[in-house]
Design a protein with these regions (language model features):
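Short glycine/serine/threonine-rich phosphate/pyrophosphate-binding segments
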Residues: 19-22, 44-47, 74-75, 99-105, ...
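N-terminal small/polar loop signature for handling phosphorylated ligands or for N-terminal nucleophile
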Residues: 43-115, 229-240
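A glycine/threonine-rich phosphate-anchoring loop and its flanking beta-alpha core
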Residues: 112-208, 299-302, 306
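Active-site segments that bind and position negatively charged phosphate/pyrophosphate groups
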Residues: 202-328
């Protein structure tokens, strides 16, 4: 058993209608003026205004920043930091999926301590507490509301940098399943499978512990048992709450056990080709699961039974059966069949040749090898292994 310790200094509220508790959380932080960071789609849907109105009705001032893109950039963090400073706000509300939360965490750092977010890349470089932050997820995917990470794209390097510090943990997390019901099926699928992969990679990680295992197993049970149902019918509040809670547990699991080759390899795919994070992960998962099968010590059976409609017993199971089950799940929820298709879909009509995609593989492998997640993957990997895995995923 690996030695382990855990630290979760957060207030977490889960349940339908809990968005209404936002002013109460803000008051406990001593806040009077919010900077609400979100995305343009949620603004158009009225979700941003709904959250803002709760704060305004409680007598608080609200400024809104919604210029957050998928795979948010260093430039976006700089713009949001400037907006925060100009507003006079004293706390931040992150409303959305992983992108607004990544930006909000980064702004919490740079607004307080100055400089570029690139200066805080790596582990434990944030000098102290950041601007008080309340996180409200509108997707069941990233688990960012309970993680100590911010992932930002540096276009000058075609690289997704990671800031890791327990100071990034939001003070409050509000998980309201009613906020998930308007998500398109494609978003629900990509985010949901991302959450499942957080749990799966934490579960097979060489850094796994009894604590992270407990979180990961419950996450896989909740997500595996509800993802097909939720993607098919996003207004199903019971399924939405299960997905949201599963994503929460998965976020806690990987905060302690870390991830693996799937995430190490998916970040370069998003940086080079702007493929949605969850889609990149989902396409890579069966390839990595097959690669890691040689290192399985009985955990693949449990993972299989969490996602397969028909459970099996130990004497019926072979590790490669999990690979087939993952591909079946991806197909059921509309995930692209391979990385080439995912990249071309992300280009939205812009032509890209096989040769152009392949020309980036060496650089992507270099970036993947820089990830700390490689170190805890259950099967060791060299650069040439990562290159082969990218080609296999195409």
């Amino acid at each position: 058993m690996n030695p382990f310790e855990f630290f979760i200094p957060q207030n977490i509220t889960v349940g339908a209608g809990t968005l209404a508790k936002l002013p109460e959380c803000a008051k406990k932080l001593g806040g009077s003026h919010a900077m609400l960071i979100s995305g343009p789609t949620l603004r158009k849907m009225g979700v941003v205004d709904k959250a803002a109105d709760y704060l305004k009705d409680a007598g608080m001032a609200v400024d809104i920043f919604t210029d957050v893109e998928a795979n948010p950039s260093v430039t976006t963090v700089e713009k949001a930091t400037e907006a925060y400073k100009d507003s006079g706000a004293d706390f931040i509300v992150a409303l959305g999926g992983g992108s607004p939360m990544d930006v909000a965490k980064a702004v919490g750092v740079t607004a307080k301590y100055g400089g570029s977010i690139t200066e805080y890349e790596g582990a434990h470089k944030v000098p102290g507490k950041i601007v008080p932050l309340i996180a409200i997820p509108t997707t069941a995917g990233t688990g960012s509301e309970v993680t100590a990470f911010s992932v930002i794209t540096d276009h000058s390097r075609d690289y997704k940098l990671t800031v890791f510090s327990y100071e990034l943990l939001p003070a409050y997390a509000i998980l309201d399943p009613e906020l998930l019901t308007s998500a398109p099926a494609s978003v629900a699928a990509a985010c949901g499978i991302d959450a499942f992969i957080h749990a799966e990679e934490a579960y097979v990680s060489t850094a796994a512990s009894p604590f992270s295992d407990a979180m990961a197993e419950k996450a896989m049970e909740l997500i595996g048992g509800n993802i097909r149902r939720f993607v098919a019918r996003r207004t199903d509040l019971e399924a939405a709450e299960a997905m949201l809670t599963g994503s929460l547990f998965a976020g806690i699991a990987f905060s302690f056990a870390r991830l693996g080759n799937v995430h190490a390899m998916s970040h370069p795919v998003s940086a080079f080709f702007n493929v949605a994070h969850g889609v990149a992960n989902a396409v890579l998962l069966p390839v990595i699961a097959e690669y890691n099968a040689l290192a399985d010590h009985g955990r693949y059976l449990k993972i299989y039974n969490y996602i397969s409609p028909i459970p099996v017993y130990e004497d019926e199971f072979e590790p490669l059966m999990l690979v087939d089950a993952i591909r079946e799940l991806n197909e059921d929820i509309g995930i692209p069949e391979d990385l080439t298709i995912a990249i071309r879909q992300a280009k939205k009509g812009e032509e890209i040749s096989d040769e152009e995609i392949e020309s980036k593989i060496d650089a992507m492998a270099d970036d993947a090898m820089k990830s700390g997640n490689i170190a805890v993957n259950p099967r060791s990997s060299r650069k040439q292994d990562i290159v082969k895995l990218y080609y296999k995923a195409l």
